[in-house]
């Protein structure tokens, strides 16, 4: 009997997710690529794991009615899909330690003060990468508009926004 290797499971899951709703086709892949560019100076093993988590970070959306709201740049109170994604990450994947990153990927920076520093940082990176992908995919506006929208320290960590800006200058993230 041949078993499916763990590295193939993420590919199978992401391809399956892409068939369910066309608005999220390859969204996880683009968020992962944006995160990788933002985290260029972090340990490669951690970046790899975070990118795998990013591929499936919105898995919980397929279980909710939030899909129409999460594809907009401005998201308000879209927690349900994050909770389902968190539970999936914690219980079904080898990324249990990153489950809170998925849980908080729509949380404002000011709400994360009690969390571990690393969780806060990676959740903000995923949040900003997620918002950037929605902006690039669904809004036909200049990149400067994105940076203006992200210029809100209560919601977005300025150091994380600076990472996005540098990555975008280096790589033209809109083209991902």
What are these regions (language model features)?
Residues 48-54, 95-128, 133-141, 146-176:
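Histidine/acidic-rich helix-loop-helix segments that form or flank divalent-metal centers
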